[in-house]
């Protein structure tokens, strides 16, 4: 989305276009997984801090989203912070699956997305369910850790981070 200009200040684009671009350039394993991920990243009941700004029927906890040809999206302002500096050689790139283009090995991310949005998924013989934490509390903890020279476990116990927030469908 970043490469094609579907950014927070730009126009919304059909989700089918986004899915096609992702499938063609980065993930050739089917559109259902890609669209499902795009939808979840725009649902405020699935993601604590949405990374996609949705337009159209992205579903409810009880009902599925409309087909990708009827929905539109663009990056949220928060998601642009995950890519800030990507054009400034801040991360390494590697060839994509076909070798036609490159993709970042990691995102330069200005915030810890895994901690604030959590993660859940299933793979072969494994499952994970990491609930999200509060962005402000995580930010304060990171700032404290960066300011404190050689922090000890006792110092880290002074940081207040509430229990993770559990998502409820």
Regions found by a protein language model. Give the residues of each.
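Conserved phosphate/anionic-ligand binding catalytic regions in large, soluble enzymes, centered on
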Residues: 28-35, 109-136
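Proline-centered turn/helix-capping motifs that create local helix->coil transitions or kinks
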Residues: 45-52, 74-91
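Single conserved hydrophobic/aromatic residue that forms the stacking wall/gate
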Residues: 159-169
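P-loop NTPase nucleotide-binding/switch module
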Residues: 61, 82-110
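Structured, non-catalytic alpha/beta "coupling" segments that mediate domain-domain communication
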Residues: 29-52
């Amino acid at each position: 989305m970043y490469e094609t200009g579907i950014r927070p200040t730009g126009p919304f684009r059909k989700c089918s276009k986004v899915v096609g671009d992702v499938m063609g350039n980065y993930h050739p394993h089917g559109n259902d997984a890609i669209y499902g991920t795009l939808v979840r990243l725009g649902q405020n009941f699935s993601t604590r801090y949405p990374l996609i700004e949705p337009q159209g029927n992205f579903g409810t906890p009880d009902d599925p989203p409309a087909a990708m040809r009827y929905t539109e999206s663009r990056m949220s302002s928060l998601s642009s912070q995950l890519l800030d500096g990507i054009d400034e050689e801040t991360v390494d790139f590697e060839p994509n699956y076909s070798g036609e283009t490159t993709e970042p090995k990691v995102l330069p991310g200005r915030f810890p997305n895994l901690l604030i949005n959590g993660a859940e998924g299933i793979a072969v013989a494994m499952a994970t369910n990491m609930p999200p934490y509060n962005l402000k509390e995580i930010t304060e903890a990171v700032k404290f850790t960066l300011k404190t020279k050689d922090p000890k476990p006792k110092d880290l116990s002074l940081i207040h981070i509430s229990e993770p927030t559990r998502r409820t469908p």
